[in-house]
């Protein structure tokens, strides 16, 4: 019985660890979503700004800078989307581990009662 309690306690600790990790991943995903949205807004802002700048203003250098900034922001959006996909995958894996652990714990308790 003591082994069952010890194993049960270890299972609970592992479950809590996984639960916290899952919540951290959810927070990271939310943070990345905000970063994606912010950078998409910056891309739109730069697109609008680019429409107002004309060659008559002799700002070819400014256009080049804006284009570089736009490319940089688009790259960041892509990077955050990739990172979000990785975090979501890890979150799903943790959720499956938690589900399996919960099932195993229930079976362990059932065996202990028998």
Swiss-Prot record:
Keywords: Coiled coil, Cytoplasm. InterPro entries: DUF496 (IPR007458). Residues 70-111 form a coiled coil. GO terms for cellular component: cytosol. It is found in: Cytoplasm. Its main location: cytoplasm. It comes from the Bacteria. PANTHER family: UPF0265 PROTEIN YEEX. Belongs to the pole-localizer TmaR family. HAMAP family: Pole_loc_TmaR (MF_00683). Pole-localizer protein involved in the regulation of several cellular processes. This is Pole-localizer protein TmaR. It comes from Mannheimia succiniciproducens (strain KCTC 0769BP / MBEL55E). The lineage of its organism: Bacteria, Pseudomonadati, Pseudomonadota, Gammaproteobacteria, Pasteurellales. The gene is tmaR.
